Amino acid sequence: MVMQHATKYVSVDAIPNKRAISIEWPENIIGEFEKNIYIGTNEKNMKPLICIDILLSENQANGALNFIVRSDAFESHYTYKVIDGNVSIDNVSTPLCINIGRSTLSLSEFLCKDRYFPTVRFVDGTTLQGQYMAEYRNEDVLFDREKIQVWDWVGVNIKNESQGNEKDNTSIQYCVIKKLKEQNFDIIFDDDNAGEIADVIAIKVDDVNKKVKVELFHLKFSQEDRPGARINDLYAVNGQAQKCVSWLHTKPEHILGRMLKRGASGPKNRYELGTQEQLSIIREKVKSLYEVEYIVNIV
């Protein structure tokens, strides 16, 4: 019975010919180590990892995975290949370097190291790290229809996802934040842009039961003017939601600490409700053994 849900690892000779839905940083640089990691076009133009995105390119080809590493200051394109069991990650445009502690090397070289292969997730639930494919022997579980909520989108431009610095009141994100403000949250945080865990993070503290609820909201704009059951939109937003799971395996105070750093940097005020001081207090409560519950929402 234990082996029924075991994970099987298979060495592959080439990139599998199936749809990839997300790419993630290696798990062992998330959390504790990320605060000491910087990426940039040169040693004088470095950004912390919390401000860097890694994502699949819209243009894919058989036998390779094209992906992008970007921040608000640069965008770099890479190609990930497996040829006869050997991994290559090559820069296509705008080469980047990575700084860890006192060590600096090219991002291509770093990502080809055994411990630092990116994680690629495929639509069938398998993952690829380096030349190893992980197959999870879990039974498919149907999503509970009762958990699907229907919202009123009148007045919202469903092709416009982000509210931006100007807080566009016709955007999907603005609408979501407005609805969350009607609920009993202590913190509502705009985490949008490169390096995000989610588009919106909402936090509620229960001091009586010593619990902290953290809700992550992943948003996806519609590719067309009218709503529809478009599988491409579903793949995209589910890929985003799966990426944040790696964060949920780190210590909760790492997520809150990361929010504090992002909230204190840049011109954008990310606190839609609550303050940096309140978030700092919540982080201390989490460190003092408050139980944390995570809920992932797709909008």
Where are the regions a protein language model picked out?
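Residue-identity detector for glutamine
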Residues: 4, 60, 129-131, 149, ...
